[in-house]
């Protein structure tokens, strides 16, 4: 955090020709087949659902007119793609009317009709709040789709017949999105600072946030940063550091306000998304990024079409620099060990500005981790009796989380489209389980084990599965890999069939890949045909050491290569 200071007409019934061309163009360039299918099922006429996006834009009056004009074109494009915008103005003692005028111009320039609604909420005599979105539902009928609501942050009090500007915008937005409201599929917060900052990404924005998992930690971290800035304490008692605090006082004040907004944005996202469908998505970015004309670079359009961020959140934050790690390819004759160069991640991509300032959020899924080295009847449900252990001493607490073996097997069977030999598999992993990660109600799962010699073991991703209908959605794969990398930051290995269509995705998340068919030890003819590739993820320190250690590499490769699959009728494949 301190580095930043101390370092220098809307139609839904039949799209016109330009709209069709736009849809085809964008789908051809940004979406996978699954994403295209999901988009078409949700946003075309046949879905029978009118989709809306809710905008909350901070400091719109500070944005250059040229950017506002470009943003107007994006609003028009979103409408063509089936997403009707609605705007809520943030409370401000001086700028509400100015922002209302600017939004009026933006909507008008997009060939739409602004509909100004002064009171977003009505407080009844009983103390209950009622949203204008539910009270004025007639404005959201398909026949009125050209009318774009612009809601001011006022509350009308029925008991006193008066209105007042809200002082609690989080509560205001929470109440606004309750009740029988239109279907809101996206919640966009635009500002000048961008998404929620991440220390792991050099204070650039988090790529993806699973609120169910990360809200408490992130809100605590932001609150701590605010507290630190408020104290105005120097980095040390050194005279220069004390002078820095005085000289940079305006920047510190500005950053403090910025972090207050970040915390408020996070809480806004949590409250609003809690009131919407589980599939709803939140996105925080800058107005400048939201105004980009390129469909590949614009985070709003890209998220509408794919329901994900511009880049994946589970991509490694480090890669080897050229010449930093000696390539071990020459150790194994002409068989190559592939390493991703540093520019794949660290160099600015073509859409770098938007990537670095955009955070995508989901209310998300609950996550459970089972750190049991051995599965027993006391920490699991449905475990075959042959794996039961004698009860010794005090009986384990019945409140401790238990792994559901039936669901465990079911998700693996469905994901891999083959039947797991449960007895054989548990026999193989029991006693050396590193962790088991379960997403939601067994919608995603990862089983990690310790492999290799006991004195020099390594973490191995033995099974990674997502229910077929959820692959590519909710960021489940990214959530699992992020958890793995955080839990085991030094190194993780996994293998995949050579013809696996997911290998490109795996390749992007590894720092090295090896064909397991190579001769591991030419002197002793240790060569076997294998249908697998080995993927290696490691931080720079571990990777540098491992990739130079021929003995360690052979241990990796031999251990992973010789693991026998535990599928029924498929025991002899290697």
Swiss-Prot record:
N-acetyltransferase domain sequence ranges: 392-560
Gene: ARG2
Signal peptide stretch: none
Gene Ontology MF terms: L-glutamate N-acetyltransferase activity
Key word Acyltransferase present: yes
Top class in the EC scheme: transferase
Protein name: Amino-acid acetyltransferase, mitochondrial
Record localization: Mitochondrion
GO cellular component term, pick one: mitochondrial matrix
pH dependence: Optimum pH is 8.5-9.5.
EC annotation from Swiss-Prot or TrEMBL: 2.3.1.1
């Amino acid at each position: 955090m301190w580095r930043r200071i101390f370092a220098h007409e809307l139609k839904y019934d039949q799209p016109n020709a330009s709209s069709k061309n736009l849809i085809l163009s964008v789908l051809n360039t940004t979406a996978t087949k699954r994403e295209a299918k999901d988009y078409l099922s949700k946003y075309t006429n046949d879905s029978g659902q009118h989709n809306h996006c809710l905008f909350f834009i901070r400091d719109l009056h500070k944005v250059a007119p040229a950017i506002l004009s470009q943003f107007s074109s994006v609003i028009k494009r979103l409408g063509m793609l089936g997403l009707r915008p609605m705007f809520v103005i943030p409370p401000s003692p001086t700028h509400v009317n100015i922002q209302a005028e600017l939004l009026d111009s933006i909507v008008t320039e997009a060939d739409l009709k602004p509909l100004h609604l002064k009171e977003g909420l009505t407080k009844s005599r009983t103390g209950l709040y009622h949203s204008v979105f539910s009270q004025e539902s007639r404005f959201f009928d398909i026949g009125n789709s050209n009318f774009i609501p612009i809601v001011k942050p006022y509350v009308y009090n029925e008991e006193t017949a008066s209105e007042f500007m809200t002082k609690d915008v989080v509560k205001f937005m929470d109440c606004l999105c309750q009740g029988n409201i239109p279907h809101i599929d996206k919640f966009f917060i635009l500002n000048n600072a961008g998404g929620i900052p991440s220390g792991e990404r050099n204070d650039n924005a988090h790529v993806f946030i699973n609120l169910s998992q990360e809200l408490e930690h992130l809100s605590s971290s932001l609150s701590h940063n605010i507290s630190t800035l408020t104290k105005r304490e120097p980095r040390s008692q050194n005279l220069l550091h004390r002078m820095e605090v005085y000289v940079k006082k305006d920047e510190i004040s500005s950053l403090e306000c910025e972090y207050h907004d970040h915390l408020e944005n996070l809480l806004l996202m949590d409250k609003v998304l809690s009131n919407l469908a589980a599939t709803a998505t939140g996105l925080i970015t800058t107005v400048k990024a939201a105004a980009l004309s390129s469909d590949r670079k614009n985070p709003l359009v890209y998220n509408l079409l794919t329901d994900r961020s511009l880049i994946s959140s589970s991509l490694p934050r480090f890669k080897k620099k050229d010449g930093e790690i000696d390539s071990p390819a020459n150790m194994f004759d002409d068989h190559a060990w592939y390493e991703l160069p540093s520019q794949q991640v660290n160099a600015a991509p073509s859409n770098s500005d938007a990537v670095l300032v955009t955070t995508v959020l989901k209310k998300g899924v609950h996550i459970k981790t089972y750190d049991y080295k051995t599965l027993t009847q006391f920490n699991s449900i449905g475990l075959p009796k042959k794996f039961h252990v004698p009860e010794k001493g005090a009986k384990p607490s019945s409140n401790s989380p238990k792994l559901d073996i039936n669901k465990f097997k079911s998700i693996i069977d469905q994901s891999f489209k083959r039947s797991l030999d449960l007895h054989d598999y548990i026999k193989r992993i029991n006693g050396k389980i590193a962790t088991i990660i379960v997403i939601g109600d067994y919608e995603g799962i990862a089983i990690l084990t310790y492999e290799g010699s006991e004195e020099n073991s390594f973490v191995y991703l033995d099974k990674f599965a997502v229910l077929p209908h959820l692959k590519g959605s909710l960021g489940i794969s990214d959530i699992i890999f992020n958890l793995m990398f955080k839990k085991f930051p030094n190194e993780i290995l996994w293998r995949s069939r050579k013809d696996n269509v997911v290998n490109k995705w795996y390749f992007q998340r590894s720092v090295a890949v090896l064909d397991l068919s190579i001769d591991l030890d030419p002197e002793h003819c240790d060569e076997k045909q294998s249908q697998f590739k080995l993927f290696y993820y490691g931080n720079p320190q571990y990777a540098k050491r491992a990739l130079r250690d021929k003995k360690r590499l052979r241990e990796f490769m031999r251990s992973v290569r010789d693991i026998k699959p535990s599928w029924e009728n498929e025991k002899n494949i290697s």
